[in-house]
């Protein structure tokens, strides 16, 4: 499956009606080359990997693309509809609640794509990169907060 921005816009409209009751506003889309992320959401923009190289494949299959794209749309939903722009905990309770709702109603399981499915296929360098990012995002601010409180 070859990805284009037009295809992303078309799928956004389709999935918006199917999973979000047409609540989401159209956002911007970008395709990018990456080694370990399949998708990413930044304020008002959904980034999708051109090819899922980390999964050992060169092309997307339909189910994997749908799970990844709807996953990023849930981030867009939490940010725009719920008004919560959480960068520290992007997969917090609002994200998980909407994801479980979609899984319960439609059987679409997006929670298994949060670094779980692909982690085993990464190189040691990529795994260290992920852990370094986690340390910067979660552990350092948490330790700072604890030292500031106590």
Task: Enumerate the predicted regions with their spans.
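Metalloprotease/metallohydrolase-associated module, dominated by Zn2+-dependent proteases
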Residues: 1-63, 80-150
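Active-site recognition of the HExxH zinc-binding catalytic motif
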Residues: 67-80
């Amino acid at each position: 499956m070859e990805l284009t921005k037009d295809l992303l816009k078309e799928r956004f409209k389709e999935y918006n009606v199917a999973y979000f009751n047409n609540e989401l506003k159209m956002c911007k889309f970008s395709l990018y080359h990456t080694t370990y992320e399949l998708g990413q959401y930044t304020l008002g923009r959904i980034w999708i990997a051109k090819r899922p190289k980390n999964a050992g494949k060169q092309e997307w299959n339909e189910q994997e693309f749908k799970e990844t794209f709807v996953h990023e749309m849930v981030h867009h939903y939490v940010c725009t509809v719920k008004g919560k722009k959480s960068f520290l905990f992007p997969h917090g309770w609002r994200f998980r609640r909407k994801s479980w709702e979609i899984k319960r109603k439609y059987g679409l399981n997006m929670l298994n794509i949060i670094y779980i499915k692909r982690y085993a296929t990464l190189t040691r360098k990529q795994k260290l990169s992920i852990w370094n990012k986690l340390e910067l995002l979660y552990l350092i601010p948490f330790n700072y907060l604890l030292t500031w409180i106590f």
